[in-house]
Design a protein with these regions (language model features):
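Adenosine-cofactor binding site in Rossmann-like domains, unifying the SAM/SAH pocket
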Residues: 27-49
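C-terminal amphipathic/interface module of NAD(P)-dependent oxidoreductases
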Residues: 282-284, 299-341
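Glycine-rich NAD(P)-binding loop of the Rossmann-fold in SDR/ketoreductase-type enzymes
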Residues: 42, 73-88, 125, 129, ...
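Mid/C-terminal beta-alpha module of Rossmann-like enzyme folds, strongest
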Residues: 224, 245, 252-297, 331-341
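NAD(P)H-binding glycine-rich loop region in Rossmannoid oxidoreductase-like domains
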Residues: 41-81, 92-94
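Conserved Rossmann-fold NAD(P)-dependent oxidoreductase catalytic core, especially the SDR/UDP-sugar
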Residues: 87-130, 150-156, 171-180, 185
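NAD(P)-dependent short-chain dehydrogenase/reductase
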Residues: 143-154, 182, 186-234, 241
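N-terminal Rossmann NAD(P)H-binding glycine-rich loop of SDR-like oxidoreductase domains
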Residues: 1-22
């Protein structure tokens, strides 16, 4: 199976490339790494060009503009990168018979749920910020493209999802002429999988654990406690684990539909921060604050918990605590190296 990964230089992209290199179904040539400048979200021709040149059987779209505050400041750019770029890619995929795995986010939900249940794919999405709106528009664009050209957006026989985006949003901007010269592989209807995840972390740096450790160091130097939000709750997800979950889908051969793939469990930002500091033996007290106390362009959903969907192997992702235990040595080495410098 020839698999291409967009955003191959990013957090999830790197994890996917590493996992695919060891996967038995990718063959001797290995995965295709699409990244800038060859694949650029701002380039309307990038999808057609990359598919025509490399002829993948599956594209995993991990590229996105994930700067949530930037999306709030520049919502038109957010739509360009997270919706129109998806529309162009989905159109190119379905016209060439290429399967598409679209990575999306918990922020398609507004987080106002009060029953302490995780969001399922059957729950109707309702974004509460421009980033979530742009990602939901991307989901809708991909579904519209696949529905419009005979692709599969559900596993055969699967019940319909009331929460699936309809035919609206950015898909209308896709030109039928965009796929001129595309390779065609019509042996089977191409599949679309939408994979939503949450609170992604892992190498290379600048994730929540790295930032909380840096903030704790500054607080300790100032002799102050660390203030962390206590009423934002979610599902921390380790990028290598998410990559393995996506490969689980691909290995099954039949993966169309909406999937929620996160490490099991839920935790507040403050308690996750405490867990990180304890694991790295950093003794700085955390004082809980509220989301309302922070002023920023984008407001994250207070309840970001996704209910994991069953993977084809039957094995869900492990609890977030076990996943973080594998990341802890990486953080420890980085901190030790920074101290020596």
């Amino acid at each position: 199976m020839r698999v291409a990964v967009t955003g191959a230089g990013g957090r999830l992209g790197r994890a996917l490339i590493a996992a695919l290199e060891d996967a038995p179904f990718t063959g001797p040539l290995g995965p295709l790494a699409w990244s800038r400048p060859a694949y650029d979200l701002d380039d309307p021709e990038a999808a057609v060009r990359c598919i025509r040149q490399t002829v993948p059987e599956v594209v995993i779209h991990a590229a996105a503009w994930t700067d949530v505050d930037g999306c709030a400041r520049e919502p038109e750019r957010a739509m360009r990168r997270n919706a129109l770029a998806v529309a162009e890619l989905a159109d190119a995929c379905v016209r060439s018979g290429t399967d598409l795995v679209l990575v999306s986010t918990n922020e398609v939900f507004d987080g106002r749920r009060t029953d302490s249940r995780g969001y399922t794919p059957e729950d109707g999405p309702r974004p509460g910020n421009p980033y979530g709106a742009s990602k939901l528009a991307g989901e809708a664009a991909a579904q519209a493209a696949f529905l419009g050209h005979g692709g599969l957006i559900e596993r055969p026989g699967a019940p319909g999802r009331s929460g699936a985006p309809g035919r609206s949003g950015a898909a209308g901007a896709v030109s039928a002429s965009a796929a001129v010269g595309m390779p065609a592989r019509p042996a089977a209807a191409p599949q679309l999988a939408i994979v939503r995840t949450a609170w992604l972390y892992g190498p290379p740096g600048n994730d929540f654990p790295v930032r909380i450790l840096a903030s704790a160091d500054r607080a300790r130097a100032a002799g102050e406690p660390l203030h962390v939000v206590g009423d934002e709750i979610g599902s921390p997800t380790f990028a290598p684990d998410l990559a393995e979950g996506i490969l689980d889908l691909l290995a099954s051969g039949t993966f169309a539909g909406i999937h929620h793939i996160v490490n099991a469990g839920a935790v507040s930002r403050a308690d996750w921060g405490r867990h990180i500091l304890a694991a790295l033996e950093v003794e700085v007290p955390i004082v809980e604050t509220s989301l309302a106390a922070w002023t920023r362009p984008s407001t994250p959903p207070a309840w970001s918990v996704l209910a994991p969907t069953a993977l084809p192997s039957g094995e869900p992702l492990r609890p977030w605590q076990a996943a973080f235990a594998d990341y802890r040595p990486v953080l420890a080495r980085e901190r030790a190296g920074a101290t020596r410098r």
